[in-house]
Amino acid sequence: MIDLSTLTPQLQATHWGWTIALFLWFIGLSGMGFFINYWVRQKNFVYVLTFCGIAGLALVTSHLGRLSNLPFVIFYALRDFSFNFQSWMMIGIVLLSLLSVGSVFYSMICAGIIFKGSKWQKLAQSNGFNAVFSVLGVCSTIYSGFLLTQAVGVSLWNSSLIPVLWIMSGLTSSIAMLELMSAMGLVDHKSVGWCSRTSVWVDTAKLFAIFSFVYVALGSEIGRASCRERV
């Protein structure tokens, strides 16, 4: 069996650069947006989440070394049915690929492209269909947080609270996007009227997560020394 890990090695976390911030924002917005969409189910919101999911997948894929080998890796992995699920990058690409492909399918139903007719519209509005995207979105958001915890030697990143913080951040971003789209008349105002009230509680929970995150990160002498080196 071919060792595929040598074909597209993951770049070290400390060399990811500024694009990692865009990846985290896009995936947080798309992932938790699909969680919120379980109750909202607005097609324009789905379009935005689809774009964010695809952009996040493209950015995380760009952090693979020797990117030109990726088509060969996909081919051999599918042929031999050999997937390295011990790799965070592999798990992430699978999750984000499912989210991206699924969201494109969702968007095509909403836009009436190829998948036309009332049966497809009923599918897009069904609880089970949206529950699948909700779970997949939350898992993708949690993954993006766990990916950061794998960084070695980067202050404040290797904390177990990072995934929790990312869920709170994703919820905040998705609710803010809904409020913005509501103000622009892109979504039904009545369906998102609860956003203003919910955003207060989400922001409060996010602040609590941030303070807990900093407290845990600075709770040891090693953590404090590491932060002092970064200042």
Locate the predicted segments by residue.
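Cytosolic juxtamembrane amphipathic/interface segments immediately preceding
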Residues: L7-T14, D80-F85, F115-K122
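Long, contiguous internal "core" modules enriched in hydrophobic/ aromatic residues
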Residues: G17, F26, Q42, V94, ...
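Membrane-interfacial helical/loop segments at transmembrane boundaries in membrane proteins
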Residues: M1-I2, V73-A77, R224
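Membrane helical hairpin/interfacial module
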Residues: I27-L95, G102
